[in-house]
Regions:
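A C-terminal-region feature
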Residues: 1-49, 69-196
């Protein structure tokens, strides 16, 4: 994680302590702050033990190491998330509880091959998962294709894969350089595209 954090800080500056928020900027109307990247403070490890009990398994070793340092991460204006062990009262910048998200994501609905998968994050239409019965890899499941599209030995490898792409998609002010043109013409998109 240190290598990833150093890479982000080299482009946007240091993380500032709050819930560990990173490089805030005003939207054009100046009425709200936005955060490009957020690292959430770790929670008591007893919460991790409760999550293990809920899923009836250990967690992938690289996830355990991550959760000892952080209670989730939000990167690139929520484009990529690693869920937290528990939620908090932070409102918009909530780490998303891994247990609640697994109920919502329902990875098992995509086929029997995912029966032992636990979802721990996402990017776009892809869910990040580990297999409760085999810790060799962390998996990326494309929910549109309903299949595993990538596998990584560690969380650091998985995050590096996505950060390599996403870091160049945002300028030094945190503005997305290439927004989804399919949103053009939608009333809400016309208002918000200037902030993407």
């Amino acid at each position: 994680m240190n290598k990833l954090i150093n890479r982000l800080e080299s482009k946007w500056g240091s993380f500032e302590k709050d819930q560990h928020y990173f490089k805030q900027w005003d939207t054009s109307n100046g009425q709200r702050k936005s955060y490009l990247n957020v690292l959430f403070d770790p929670v008591d490890l007893s919460s991790l033990y409760l999550a293990k009990e809920y899923f009836k398994c250990e967690f992938h070793p690289s996830l355990l190491k991550f959760y000892e340092q952080y209670n989730g991460i939000m990167l690139f204006s929520e484009s990529l998330r690693i869920y937290g062990i528990e939620s908090n009262d932070a409102g918009l910048y909530d780490p998303y509880c891994i247990i609640a998200q697994n109920i919502d994501d329902n990875i098992q609905a995509y086929g029997e091959q995912f029966a032992n998968f636990v979802v721990f994050g996402y990017y776009s239409s892809c869910l990040f998962c580990f297999d409760k019965t085999n810790f060799d890899f962390l998996y990326v499941v494309d929910t549109e294709q309903e299949k595993v599209v990538y596998s990584f030995k560690s969380l650091a490898e998985l995050l590096a894969h996505y950060v390599d792409y996403l870091i160049d998609e945002y300028d030094v002010c945190g503005k997305k350089l290439h927004y989804d043109k399919s949103l053009e013409g939608l009333p809400i998109a016309n208002v918000s595209l200037e902030f993407i």
